[in-house]
């Protein structure tokens, strides 16, 4: 895995797939934001949070980066508790 600091061993298939997707975004800044968050928090996310994380990974990098770093306000359907955890985790 590109950049991941943890082993995917012991993670279920869904979490392993999300870990790979988080680290292989296409925009290096988002690799670091989402990949580091996934390394640290993915194993402990609930099923609902995993679903939310999957939806966040579908958002184009440029848009997600603007929301994460606060240059644009995230829409209400994106500004979930999980999104706020990602923003708090990322030092912007």
Language model regions located:
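Positively charged, polar, low-complexity stretches
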Residues: 2-92
């Amino acid at each position: 895995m590109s950049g991941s600091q943890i082993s995917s061993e012991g993670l279920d298939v869904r979490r392993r797939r999300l870990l790979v997707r988080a680290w292989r975004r296409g925009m290096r800044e988002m690799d670091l934001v989402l990949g580091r968050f996934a390394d640290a928090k993915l194993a402990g996310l609930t099923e609902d949070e995993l679903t939310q994380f999957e939806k966040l990974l579908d958002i184009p990098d440029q848009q997600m980066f603007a929301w994460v770093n606060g240059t644009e306000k995230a829409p209400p359907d994106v500004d979930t508790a999980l999104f706020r955890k990602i923003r708090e985790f990322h030092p912007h």
